[in-house]
Curated annotation (Swiss-Prot):
Belongs to the universal ribosomal protein uL30 family. The keyword Membrane does not apply. CDD domains: Ribosomal_L30. One of its GO terms (molecular function) is structural constituent of ribosome. The keyword tRNA processing does not apply. SUPFAM superfamilies: Ribosomal protein L30p/L7e. GO terms for cellular component: large ribosomal subunit. Pfam families: Ribosomal_L30. GO terms for biological process: translation. This is Large ribosomal subunit protein uL30. Signal peptide: none annotated. Keywords: Ribonucleoprotein, Ribosomal protein.
């Protein structure tokens, strides 16, 4: 499977509680924090919910 790197580029404040919970489940707390994951359908769905807050790169 491919790996995905997710980077938080916008603040989580001012968003809905569901979006904040999604960021927390991705492990993103601070701006410019990055996490790497294996690409799964669940992960892709989570990223779609917060796509305006994160930057995604595939490797």
């Amino acid at each position: 499977m491919a790996n995905i790197t997710v980077k938080l580029v916008r603040s989580r404040y001012g968003n809905t509680p569901k979006q904040r919970a999604t960021l927390a489940s991705l492990g993103l707390k601070k701006i410019r924090q990055e996490r790497s994951f294996e690409k799964t359908d669940t992960l892709v769905g989570m990223i779609a919910k917060v796509q305006h807050l994160v930057e995604v790169t595939e490797s």
